[in-house]
Amino acid sequence: MGGSTKQALLQALSAAEGAYISGQQLAEALGVSRAAVHKAAQTLSAQGYALDSAPRRGYRLAGGDPFCAEAVGPYPAPIHIYDTLQSSNLTAKQLALGGAPHGTLVLTAHQLAGRGRLGRRFESPAGKGVYLSLILRPTLSAADAQSATISAAVAVARAVKALCGLELGIKWVNDLYYQGRKVCGILTEAGTDMESGQLEWLVVGIGLNLTTSPADWPEELARTAGSLYPGGPAPVSRAVLAGAIARELLTLCPAFDCLDEYRARCFVPGHWVTVCTGAETYAAKALSIDDAGRLVVEREGGRQAALQHGEVSIRPTRTG
């Protein structure tokens, strides 16, 4: 029994919105035998779908959070899905080095050593978040790493709005916030040809807290980290949301033409911030996002800088 039958059955039952459909109706609609429908239903149940069957009534999809490639939905590139990984970005980079094509998606239910920017650990409790990495192979330039991160933030915000009805704000450059708490981080890494110095691929890693509860955070994150639906349940499955995010990002690549939308969602300009560049830390007024995606700030004394990298945090009050 092919994956196409499973996918078609899943789509038919999802469209029925919890109503029963008889085995005969499904067989006729899908152009397969009733035995094939039954086998597909068994496979979906084994993959985590809450599938009910009843004599003389048929089948219905009762809900659940299935985590499998079929649940991602139609997708134009290979999908690699895992129960547990050290890091989805690490696996994606290994696949990229092996020649995995543009759009390859790595999805995991749990990361043992998820990473954020500046080498920070990204907490990834099992079954409670969307943890994915996407391989991009457009015509690449050095500026594309920043553009890909910006586009990924927009892709997450679009997908969450479409499927959850929630509006996320963006904190330059790579964090998304909901109700004042960080719910998503993005890490973009690049592979370079050693001879030419040209970028060969980008791996965009996205970690979105979906149903993580306060008890899941270590103490140092408890006051700043959040999730879309703390403790659950969520109205959308992790795989469906991951697929929506990945498809949104692929539509933005390779043009990465979403800077105006990024600016509209970014809440940093207009605030006093603390800037940490690695070399120095200073207070500044965040002014705008320029056409290269850099954060333009004005230091005390009037000197302006356009930040390509670095970390900013909004200052709670402005004194002096």
Regions found by a protein language model. Name each.
Residues 83, 170-172:
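Short loop/edge segments at beta-strand edges and connector loops
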Residues 2-33, 140-168, 178-320:
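Long, positively charged amphipathic alpha-helical accessory segments at protein N-termini or as interdomain linkers
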Residues 2-161, 184:
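N-terminal lobe of the biotin/lipoate ligase/transferase fold
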Residues 52-55, 171, 289-290:
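Short, ordered beta-strand-loop transition motifs
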